[in-house]
UniProtKB/Swiss-Prot annotation:
This is Uncharacterized protein ORF65. It comes from the Viruses. It is found in: Host membrane. Residues 44-65 are extracellular.
Length: 65
């Protein structure tokens, strides 16, 4: 899931809710998809951090030899 796509959907949802004063965003489906969206971002960031850490460890290991 791409972040920009995800946040655009959320912004569109909030905008639609304000425009028509209909609780689209607070519906179960949308809140679940938003949760999944935030979760995917969290996983992406944590994966990137661990990947960078592994790379730095890898390089330092071979430089010390």
């Amino acid at each position: 899931m791409r972040f920009s796509n995800c946040f655009n959907k959320f912004k569109f949802c909030i905008g639609t809710e304000k425009k028509y004063s209909f609780p689209i965003c607070t519906s179960t489906y949308t809140s679940f998809s938003l949760f999944a969206c935030i979760w995917s971002i969290f996983i992406h960031i944590s994966l990137n951090k661990s990947f960078i850490y592994q790379k730095s460890w890898y390089y330092s290991f071979f430089q010390n030899r």
